[in-house]
Amino acid sequence: MAERLVTLNVNGVTIVRFKDKRIVDAGNIEQMGDEMLQLVNTQHLKQILLNFEGVEFLSSAAFNKLIELNKAVKDVGGVLRITGLRAEILEAFKMLRLNKIFDIRKTEADSLKAYGVTN
């Protein structure tokens, strides 16, 4: 994974955490997106949780890459969930009606529970 991402596996769920507070640079977004798509396309991972805790801003390019990733995960019969969104970013998801597309959970624990993982 890129220096900007941290991944870990919890009982079959791949959790991706972001190191950057502001995800705005088009080149970085493209690189992160490609690496996350690789999790789906080459490693055949079907349960991916994106944890945005600590992320303060997402650009429109980041939203586009998330839509692309969500489609790829669904195409292989998987489920992508999102957690840890700041109120401002959650509001942007709602304004763009992306909350209708993505399964957004408040906490990582809530998301893992939705995958059937219990602590």
Stretch-by-stretch model annotation:
Residues 3-34:
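STAS-typified acidic loop motif
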Residues 6-16, 49-61, 72, 112-116:
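Charged, low-complexity, helix/coiled-coil-prone segments
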Residues 12, 87, 109:
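Residues that form or immediately flank small-molecule/cofactor binding pockets and catalytic motifs
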Residues 22-101:
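Amphipathic alpha-helical interaction surfaces in cytosolic regulatory modules
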Residues 96-99, 109-119:
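A cross-taxonomic marker for long C-terminal extensions/tails that follow the last structured domain
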Residues 103-107:
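Short acidic-hydrophobic, aromatic-tinged amphipathic segments that line or gate anion-handling sites
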